[in-house]
Amino acid sequence: MPTAAPVVLPTRTRVLDAAVGLFGTRGYEATSLDQVAEASGVRKQTVLYHFGDKEGLLGAVIDRSAAELAIALERGLSRPGLEGWARVEAVVRATFKLAAHRPALLGLVREVSRLGGPPAARLTAVLEPLVHRATAFLDVEMAAGRIRTQDPRLVLLAAYTTVIGAATEVEVLRALGYPPTPRSVILRRTELLSFLRQALC
């Protein structure tokens, strides 16, 4: 029986995948275009042809990664029939699921936030519509008494920082030679949910 031919991803996709992995685990400044080219199986000139320079590559990586993160968070926010804490929990679970399947992606989000300046502004611009939705949701839930009344944007910032930090901690441990087990990830998520529930409800 003939075997199926391996799927060959488009060059641009391969370069973006490699860049997400390297920027998200090693850091942007510590990664060269030569390393990205080697990891994606192309020449450096090919990377430059598609993205112009390293900053252009970072911009494309941010756009794609932010869109992927937004889709994952949207799934949690848009689940029907959920209100109050149940919807917050759904968003946290969606984030941890993304971290399990695409750990370098959340590492990249953290790296872009660390870089600040134009890269962080670009990430914020892509996520801003989702931030508005989440803030409006918190306003409604606080008015209904299902979530403790606080400044919704500060709550969102604290929750975002806590969840992204906890989710990317998995990749940090893996890089240090302590690969997480499914049980340890579930335990970390459970602890985080308990912490957030005490802070919000």
Question: Where are the predicted features?
Answer:
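C-terminal peripheral helix-coil segments that are non-catalytic and often amphipathic
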Residues: M1-P2, K97, H101, V131-A144, ...
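Generic hydrophobic, amphipathic alpha-helix propensity
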Residues: T11-A19, V36, V61-L69, L73, ...
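Helix-turn-helix
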Residues: R14, A18, L22-G56, A60
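Conserved hydrophobic residue
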Residues: Y28-E29, P118, I147
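Hydrophobic/aromatic residues within well-ordered alpha-helical segments
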Residues: K54, V61, S65, L69, ...
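Hydrophobic alpha-helical connector segments
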Residues: A60, E74-A104, P152-A159, I186-R189
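All-alpha amphipathic helical-bundle segments outside canonical DNA-binding/catalytic cores
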Residues: A86-E89, A121-V126, M142-Y160
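Amphipathic alpha-helical segments used for helix-helix packing
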Residues: A86-R87, A99-A121, E169-A175
